């Protein structure tokens, strides 16, 4: 199930992902939980979240390589401001015995600003938000409020990010 931050967003082996465009670098990122309407420690969300990410760029596109997939986004005309979105539907429980299953839509939104408009990006700052909502026709009442789940749907949480390039020469 790809809802928990620590599970489905495993940033373990970032080097293994393919890197389109020009390499900006590998970044050590610290995320601080800014707000959550999902509940305390919902989905494994902690107050501090440390991970690594590789960033590349090609023209006005930015690529966020987390070790499991490559997410693409856009860089604004200033060459520094970026945004990346992705959506995934996750089946929590299958339908059965006269009852619909529980399917949750998770939307990830990353927004930020690179320290440089070229290829020498030493750092970036931004936010990473996760939004969760039950898909129409789903019944998630057994899951909502259970251990490690969310307190209510829809809900969201947001981390403020501070990323520093790990090696000064990319």
Predicted regions and their residues:
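Tryptophan-anchored aromatic micro-motifs
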Residues: 19-47
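Residues that flank catalytic or metal-binding motifs in active/ligand-binding sites
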Residues: 23, 51, 69, 157-159
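Predominantly extracellular/secreted and cell-surface proteins with exposed
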Residues: 33, 41-132
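Secreted/processed peptides and extracellular or luminal domains of membrane proteins
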Residues: 14, 44-46, 107-109, 146, ...
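N-terminal helix-cap/turn-to-beta initiation motif at the start of protein domains
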Residues: 11-28, 166-170
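C-terminal motif of bacterial Sec signal peptides marking the signal peptidase cleavage site
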Residues: 4-7
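Edge beta-strand at a domain terminus
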Residues: 128-170
